[in-house]
């Protein structure tokens, strides 16, 4: 590998997108931000190529699961995010790796989801 590694490159899914809106401010960047943070395909890869990034280490956007108070909903969203990330990693081998999103409301549930991410997806 000769390119750069982008560490902790955030992505979002529709379920976590709204949580990031406060960080975008009122400067009119929300539409571009939305398009870019949801994308794990062509546009993101094009940006990576232009920046000399060979591999991106993906992680769910902040505050992500921590902003979801209901433990069952947090697990549901974690699974959706992890599945989306795994799909992108499989679609673009060598371009993406990822850090699992884990619902820390219950350590046993988090451990089960981590095991699923490591061994099943």
Which residues make up each language-model segment?
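Helix-coil boundary/capping segments in enzymes
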Residues: 1-121
